[in-house]
Amino acid sequence: MIIKPRVRGFICVTTHPAGCAASVREQIAYVAGRGPIERGPKKVLVIGASTGYGLAARIAAAFGAGAATLGVFFERAPLDAKPGTAGWYNSAAFHDEAAALGLYAASINGDAFSDEIKQKTIDAIKRDLGQVDLVVYSVAAPRRTHPKTGITHQSTLKPIGQAVRLRGIDTDNEAIKETLLQPATPDEIAGTVAVMGGEDWRMWIDALDAAGVLADGAKTTAFTYLGEKVTHDIYWNGSIGEAKKDLDRTVLALRDKLAARGGDARVSVLKAVVTQASSAIPMMPLYLSLLFKVMKARGTHEGCIEQVDGLFRDSLYGAPPHVDAEGRLRADRLELDPAVQAQVLELWDRVTDDNLYALTDFAGYKTEFLRLFGFEIDGVDYDAHVDPNIRIPNLIE
């Protein structure tokens, strides 16, 4: 079948298997082109391994450090003429490329929040790897069913204390719009912390540790985004910010636990990039379009793979690591360059429907969005027929 992009709001409802595979190969080539990661990990678990930063971490570990990788994700398989999700095709391509180099790769498809998937993961580690020396936590989900209570919590993107009016782009109509977000209720804040805070990360590390599958000296990191002044009302000062503060509290206990055996736990702060999650946030398409414009002009623009490869080389396995006052690893330094943020702020209120393409890189934003789903990838023939029914080798379901 021939597959073309069909976008509805902040979701592309089609995915291109060959495009996803080509995107994975591009990322692998970038990491391989930078040479081996010195003193890198050898047996890695990535929770949330199929797209974005989690996929980039799996690629960096495997093709930068030669690591065996076990990935956990929740993706939809293709069914007859209906394509699977992009994360499914990304993971299939990763497995193929790893196998070509003789690298171990296995994946588990299911709800990472559940006890069942944690146990399946532990069983796979015991059977195939013995122990892991790095655990990457990169889960982005709108809801979480708590494994102990059975309650399903929802995350909410809202300010706290007062309503906030945000500028943004109506991406369907390519027009500037303002959105009024009402403040979160206490229950909404608690739900957001339950989904996006540190509890599930702690549950993973506790379960892995109790099962004896964490190696001495093992490290763990959870990915987060903090941003600067433009995004603070909705991130750090909003309901999501409360979840991020919970992550900061959680990491202290994890660090103490792992340090007793020579290990470490860190929150890693990464730059803003186009993801399915960020595209749904009212202000982010405008912020990203301006950020791309400014950073590309300065030659400092980076995507997921550049960010995570740099994090591995410069901080996780480099010395001295780039650490802030709270002990977080910072890979977002170029985004937060005061000159970059000043330019973004200066342009923020000047953008109109008429100058959207002139003042911002909205065209680049749209391209990056489609690339998430396997479209707009160089060298892919989108007029050719492709088979959507691709399986993932060594998949545990």
Swiss-Prot record:
<keyword id="KW-0444">Lipid biosynthesis</keyword>
<keyword id="KW-0443">Lipid metabolism</keyword>
<dbReference type="Pfam" id="PF07055">
    <property type="entry name" value="Eno-Rase_FAD_bd"/>
</dbReference>
<comment type="function">
    <text>Involved in the final reduction of the elongation cycle of fatty acid synthesis (FAS II). Catalyzes the reduction of a carbon-carbon double bond in an enoyl moiety that is covalently linked to an acyl carrier protein (ACP).</text>
</comment>
<keyword id="KW-0560">Oxidoreductase</keyword>
<feature type="binding site">
    <location>
        <begin position="48"/>
        <end position="53"/>
    </location>
    <ligand>
        <name>NAD(+)</name>
    </ligand>
</feature>
<comment type="subunit">
    <text>Monomer.</text>
</comment>
<feature type="binding site">
    <location>
        <begin position="111"/>
        <end position="112"/>
    </location>
    <ligand>
        <name>NAD(+)</name>
    </ligand>
</feature>
<dbReference type="GO" id="GO:0006633">
    <property type="term" value="P:fatty acid biosynthetic process"/>
</dbReference>
<feature type="binding site">
    <location>
        <position position="244"/>
    </location>
    <ligand>
        <name>NAD(+)</name>
    </ligand>
</feature>
<feature type="binding site">
    <location>
        <begin position="74"/>
        <end position="75"/>
    </location>
    <ligand>
        <name>NAD(+)</name>
    </ligand>
</feature>
<dbReference type="GO" id="GO:0050343">
    <property type="term" value="F:trans-2-enoyl-CoA reductase (NADH) activity"/>
</dbReference>
<comment type="pathway">
    <text>Lipid metabolism; fatty acid biosynthesis.</text>
</comment>
<dbReference type="GO" id="GO:0051287">
    <property type="term" value="F:NAD binding"/>
</dbReference>
<dbReference type="GO" id="GO:0004318">
    <property type="term" value="F:enoyl-[acyl-carrier-protein] reductase (NADH) activity"/>
</dbReference>
<dbReference type="InterPro" id="IPR024906">
    <property type="entry name" value="Eno_Rdtase_FAD-bd_dom"/>
</dbReference>
<feature type="binding site">
    <location>
        <position position="225"/>
    </location>
    <ligand>
        <name>substrate</name>
    </ligand>
</feature>
<keyword id="KW-0275">Fatty acid biosynthesis</keyword>
<protein>
    <recommendedName>
        <fullName>Enoyl-[acyl-carrier-protein] reductase [NADH]</fullName>
        <ecNumber>1.3.1.9</ecNumber>
    </recommendedName>
</protein>
<feature type="binding site">
    <location>
        <begin position="273"/>
        <end position="275"/>
    </location>
    <ligand>
        <name>NAD(+)</name>
    </ligand>
</feature>
<dbReference type="InterPro" id="IPR050048">
    <property type="entry name" value="FabV-like_NADH_b"/>
</dbReference>
<feature type="binding site">
    <location>
        <begin position="139"/>
        <end position="140"/>
    </location>
    <ligand>
        <name>NAD(+)</name>
    </ligand>
</feature>
<dbReference type="Pfam" id="PF12242">
    <property type="entry name" value="Eno-Rase_NADH_b"/>
</dbReference>
<dbReference type="InterPro" id="IPR024910">
    <property type="entry name" value="Enoyl-CoA_Rdtase_cat_dom"/>
</dbReference>
<feature type="site" description="Plays an important role in discriminating NADH against NADPH">
    <location>
        <position position="75"/>
    </location>
</feature>
<dbReference type="InterPro" id="IPR010758">
    <property type="entry name" value="Trans-2-enoyl-CoA_reductase"/>
</dbReference>
<keyword id="KW-0520">NAD</keyword>
<dbReference type="Pfam" id="PF12241">
    <property type="entry name" value="Enoyl_reductase"/>
</dbReference>
<comment type="similarity">
    <text>Belongs to the TER reductase family.</text>
</comment>
<feature type="active site" description="Proton donor">
    <location>
        <position position="235"/>
    </location>
</feature>
<keyword id="KW-0276">Fatty acid metabolism</keyword>
